[in-house]
């Protein structure tokens, strides 16, 4: 968070914000880490099957999320994504804390979204204000609604929350522009799950319109390396014009998985060849969207450097 204090700085604020972690606590405690947090305000944004190295199925993760919900006090608040069936099942297991939902047909809604990212905020059907920011995609609007609801619960007025979001600068590695060379823009995003890939590509598409998107993917997470999500990749990348996938060190064949979009997908097992192919394909007006939950061996700068060499030689 560019605008937040450094992690090692203590604040006089009584509030502490943490991203929940559903991985197991320790070898002797297989409960998810977040059952130890005991939050007063809990935001449940989305819940899908992931972390196949420790969870057998989605039901196992839902069970852990229900453990979390049960730790929120009666005077607290659960802010939940009303569009997620998995979260609806979690709440239905039993929740003794007030719940506010966000999303279409929910307590909190985003209305009149614009191509520049801005939108109106509705609560209980009443317009509360207008968020004027440049973050793209439905997932960012959902994040905004959740943060407004959570802030309201701890005493921040909706008006102030909306004003703060309008001044918000996006976090690192979320559609972060790493550079531009001769009209080719290189983005970096942490997306590594098919749903996140879908929303990230769709968000960029809403910004660039019909201009080309060159999606560059490293399936690096444990779940992706196991191949659990491989069949969902073609659909998640469908809005990209070209797809470059780094297939080294996978337990499955990326070319086979991407066969449904083979007309626009290329798989490489070495980074040098992949960067060369990306740069050869790129032209002015294109967006290169790099998606990985790791450093990807500095591929962003490699692409930018190679683009500089390409266009300076023309």
Feature-to-residue mapping (PLM):
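Extended acidic/charged loop-beta regions that coordinate divalent cations
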Residues: 1-49, 88-130, 167, 172-174
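Short, polar loop motifs at secondary-structure junctions
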Residues: 82-86, 104-105, 248-251
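Active-site flanking residues adjacent to catalytic metal/cofactor-binding acidic residues
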Residues: 18-21, 44, 80, 188, ...
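Short active-site oxyanion
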Residues: 74-78, 240-243
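Substrate-engagement module of ASCE P-loop NTPases
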Residues: 64-72
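Glycine/threonine-rich flexible loop motifs
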Residues: 27-30, 52-60, 224-226, 298-302
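Short glycine-dipeptide loop
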Residues: 72-76, 284-285
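ATP-dependent carboxylate-amine ligase
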Residues: 40-41, 66, 95-98, 111, ...
């Amino acid at each position: 968070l560019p605008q937040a204090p450094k992690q090692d700085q203590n604040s006089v604020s009584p509030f502490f914000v943490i991203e929940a972690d559903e991985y197991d606590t320790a070898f002797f405690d297989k409960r998810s880490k977040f059952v130890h947090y005991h939050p007063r305000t809990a935001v449940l944004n989305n819940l899908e099957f992931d972390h196949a190295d420790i969870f057998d199925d989605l039901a196992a993760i839902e069970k852990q999320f229900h453990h979390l919900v049960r730790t929120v006090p009666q005077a607290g608040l659960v802010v939940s994504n009303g569009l997620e069936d998995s979260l609806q099942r979690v709440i239905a297991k039993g929740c003794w804390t007030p719940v506010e939902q966000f999303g279409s047909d929910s307590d909190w809604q985003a209305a009149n979204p614009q191509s520049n990212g801005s939108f109106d905020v509705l609560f209980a059907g009443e317009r509360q204000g207008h968020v004027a920011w440049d973050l793209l995609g439905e997932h960012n609007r959902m994040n905004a609604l959740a943060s407004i609801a959570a802030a309201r619960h701890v005493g921040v007025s909706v008006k102030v929350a909306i004003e703060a979001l309008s001044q918000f600068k996006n976090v690192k590695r979320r559609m972060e522009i790493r550079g531009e060379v001769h009209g080719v823009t290189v983005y970096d995003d942490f997306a590594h799950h098919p749903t996140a890939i879908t929303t990230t590509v769709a968000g960029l598409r809403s910004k660039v319109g019909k201009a080309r998107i060159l999606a560059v993917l490293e399936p690096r997470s444990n779940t992706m390396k196991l191949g659990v999500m491989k069949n969902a990749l073609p659909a998640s990348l469908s809005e990209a014009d070209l797809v470059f996938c780094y297939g080294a060190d996978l337990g499955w064949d990326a070319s086979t998985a991407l066969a449904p979009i083979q007309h626009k997908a290329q798989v490489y097992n070495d980074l040098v060849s992949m960067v060369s192919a990306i740069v050869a394909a790129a032209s002015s007006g294109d967006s290169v969207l790099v998606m990985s939950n790791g450093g990807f061996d500095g591929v962003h700068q490699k692409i930018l450097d190679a683009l500089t060499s390409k266009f300076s030689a023309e």
